């Protein structure tokens, strides 16, 4: 049976963002920095990549390290009232499993149920069918990224903190540096557009029954910030 979320208290919000140096992470951190009074705990591997928010601001605490080694930041993680988990990995199957499955379990274990109100977990729309159910093919035939995201979602559905977890399923994400001076890192999709541009003329010869859905990282940040700063009573 899932643990009940604590009623919102007068304590100041402390929002932990993993993958805080990434595209979605930085858009989200910036939105919360500008539009809330929450203290931000930013977990990231390379603080030099953080450009969207001032790292030395009193409202920001940098937790520098790898998601696979959270013990040095156990006390800070336990103080979080909300979590926005954007960090992920793909490419190497073992690394994907450690980051996308094992590290998520460890992160949840370090949270304090007496303090935690909500976890916003980033999955992917690629593992869902049209009825928003988990695709069996995701586990059977997916890439290491798809398989580990599907495995993690299954684990979260039966986790003791399940009632406090909100899963979001982004589609194809645009965002980042398209004009000089933009402080946000470029999403992988946006970065690929420049390389693909010389070949776009070939698209007129292609026909497909598939559909593609796009979203900008700034819009994802707005949604996540709204969720993370609104009263939450559990699923």
Language-model features: locations:
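Conserved beta-loop-beta element that borders a ligand/cofactor-binding pocket
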Residues: 155-182
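Conserved Rossmann-fold NAD(P)-dependent oxidoreductase catalytic core, especially the SDR/UDP-sugar
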Residues: 41, 102-147, 166
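Short-chain dehydrogenase/reductase
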Residues: 97-101, 138-158, 210-218
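NAD(P)H-binding glycine-rich loop region in Rossmannoid oxidoreductase-like domains
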Residues: 57-105
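A conserved pocket-lining segment of Rossmann-fold NAD(P)-dependent short-chain dehydrogenase/reductase
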Residues: 190-215
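N-terminal Rossmann NAD(P)H-binding glycine-rich loop of SDR-like oxidoreductase domains
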Residues: 10-38
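Mid/C-terminal beta-alpha module of Rossmann-like enzyme folds, strongest
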Residues: 211, 215-235
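Glycine/proline-rich active-site loop of Rossmann-fold NAD(P)-dependent oxidoreductases
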Residues: 175-192, 227-235
């Amino acid at each position: 049976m899932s643990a009940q979320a604590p009623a919102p208290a007068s304590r100041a919000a402390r929002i932990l963002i993993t993958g805080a140096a990434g595209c979605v992470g930085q858009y989200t951190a910036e939105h919360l920095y500008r539009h809330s009074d929450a203290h931000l705990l930013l977990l990231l591997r390379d603080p030099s990549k953080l450009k969207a928010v001032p790292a030395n601001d009193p409202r920001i605490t940098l937790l520098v390290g790898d998601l696979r080694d959270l013990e040095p930041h156990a006390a800070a993680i336990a103080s979080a009232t909300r979590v926005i988990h954007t960090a992920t990995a793909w490419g190497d199957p073992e690394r994907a499993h450690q980051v996308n499955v094992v590290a998520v379990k460890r992160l949840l274990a370090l949270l304090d149920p007496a303090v935690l109100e909500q976890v916003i977990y980033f999955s992917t729309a690629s593992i869902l069918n049209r009825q928003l159910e988990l695709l069996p093919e995701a586990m059977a035939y997916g890439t290491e990224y798809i398989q580990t995201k599907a495995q993690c979602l299954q684990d979260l559905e039966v986790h003791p903190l399940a009632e406090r977890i909100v899963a979001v399923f982004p589609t194809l994400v645009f965002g980042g540096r398209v004009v000089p001076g933009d402080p946000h890192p470029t999403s992988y999709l946006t970065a690929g557009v420049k390389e693909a541009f010389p070949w776009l003329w070939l698209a007129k010869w292609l026909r497909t029954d598939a559909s593609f859905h796009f979203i900008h990282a700034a819009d994802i940040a707005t949604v996540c910030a709204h969720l993370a700063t609104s009263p939450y009573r559990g699923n």
